[in-house]
Each structure stands twice: as structure tokens, then as C-alpha cells.
Regions:
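Conserved acetyl-CoA-binding loop-helix of GNAT-fold acetyltransferases
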Residues: 133-145, 170
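A short beta-loop-alpha structural element at the N-terminal edge
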Residues: 4-20, 31
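Active-site rim helix/loop that mediates acceptor-substrate recognition in acyltransferases
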Residues: 35-57, 61-63, 67, 71
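C-terminal "cap" of GNAT-fold acetyltransferases
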Residues: 153-165, 181-200
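Conserved acyl-donor/pantetheine-binding loop and adjacent beta-alpha core of acyl/acetyltransferases
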Residues: 76-127, 131, 185-187
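Glycine-rich phosphate/pyrophosphate-binding loop shared by adenosine-nucleotide-utilizing enzymes
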Residues: 3-5, 64-69, 123
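Conserved GNAT acetyl-CoA-binding A-motif
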Residues: 119-124, 147-160
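Helix-loop element at the rim of GNAT/NAT acetyltransferase active sites that forms part
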Residues: 20-36
Length: 200
């Protein structure tokens, strides 16, 4: 039975629930990702984009359960090292370490492009996922409201073909740049897209 969707701050308590949502949505997004690493990769991904204390990170709850989340921060914040420290204790052997370094280089490279293209007073939409229809829209509306209240005038994000980037077209974002992903991952020919939206 569907209940009312409530929006709250995202906190460390919800990292594992968010990782489970990410795994559910993107488990097969990257062909070539070792099956045995998928759970750990998405647990890492959520930690990579979680910036403790950011007022721009949100969660959507329904009947007491996480149904969507949005991690955001001022674009001037490049992130923290807590995810790498966490992952260091999760890897088993050389093969896993090699794949992880390739994966990390891929997201680091795209995050760096987002950082370099960011404007003054811009917020980064870092990671966004929903398993409940309508919850994502509510999160995005609250995110935009919080961006304005914290002096942000626009939002930037990066995405690629493994995501539903048409969603951003449908919600008022415009394509700011696109280029071949460098480095790429698993020999995929991916394109990195940067999207931007004014929230003035």
C-alpha cells in the first residue's frame, strides 16, 4: 500500500539503504563489472558522493522506508576521502583492486569535469535515484528550493548513457557540454554529458 512521501535530510544512517536502491537500479548498467563486486561498488558509490553535513542531500521516505535519495553539495566541494578509506578494507585480491581503480578513475574523471565546468554559486547534483514514482520529482523540487535558500543560482550534474539522462531534459535541465568519457571503463565507448539548470 502506498503511503505519503516525506522529504528529510539525508544522513549517514541511510547509506546502506541508498546503496541497495542504487544496486537495484544500476546492477547491470556497466557490462563487464564483476558480479561479485557489484554490491560493494554501489556501497562505495553512495559513500563517494555523500558529503557529511551537506544541507543539499535529501531522502524520501514512504511508510518508514527509504524510497529515493538525492545527494548534493556546493559545486566547489570536490568531496571527501572517507569512501576510499572504507573501500580499502573491502577489496579481495589484485583483480578486484585493478577493477576498482578503473572504476574510481572513471567517476573521478567525470566529477573533475563537473567541477571544472561549474559556475560561481552553483550546486552539484551528485547522485540521484528513486524506486517510487513521484518521489524523485519531490526531491528535485526540495533540492532546488534549498539551493536557492543557500545562495545557489544554478545546478550542474554529469551523467552518461548508463543513466536515464532524458529525465533531466524533461525537468528543465539543458545540455551544457558533452564529450567522450576519458578515462572510460570496461572498454565502453561512453559519452559524458553535463547538464545545468537555473534556480534563480
Amino acid at each position: 500500500m502506498n503511503g505519503m512521501i516525506e522529504i528529510h535530510d539525508f544522513t549517514e544512517r541511510y547509506l546502506e539503504d541508498a546503496a541497495a536502491i542504487a544496486l537495484r537500479l544500476w546492477e547491470a548498467a556497466i557490462p563487464g563489472m564483476p558480479v561479485e563486486m557489484r554490491t560493494r561498488i554501489y556501497r562505495y558509490l553512495v559513500r563517494y558522493y555523500y558529503i557529511p553535513g551537506s544541507p543539499l542531500s535529501l531522502r524520501a521516505m514512504e511508510n518508514g522506508k527509504l524510497c529515493a535519495f538525492l545527494l548534493g553539495a556546493p559545486a566547489s566541494e570536490i568531496g571527501s576521502e572517507h569512501a576510499d578509506k572504507w573501500m580499502a578494507g573491502q577489496l579481495n585480491g589484485t583483480e578486484e583492486s585493478v577493477f576498482f581503480q578503473e572504476y574510481k578513475a572513471y567517476i573521478d574523471g567525470n566529477r573533475r569535469q563537473e567541477y571544472l565546468h561549474a559556475a560561481t554559486n552553483e550546486a552539484s547534483l551528485l547522485l540521484f535515484a528513486s524506486i517510487r514514482r513521484g518521489a524523485g520529482k519531490k526531491l528535485l523540487e526540495e533540492f532546488e528550493k534549498r539551493c536557492r535558500s543557500h545562495g545557489m543560482t544554478s545546478i550542474i550534474l554529469w551523467t552518461d548513457e548508463t543513466c536515464d539522462f532524458d529525465y533531466y531534459h524533461r525537468n528543465g535541465f539543458t545540455e551544457a557540454a558533452k564529450f567522450p568519457a576519458d578515462p572510460t571503463i570496461c572498454d565502453l565507448k561512453l559519452t559524458t554529458y553535463l547538464f545545468r539548470k537555473s534556480v534563480k
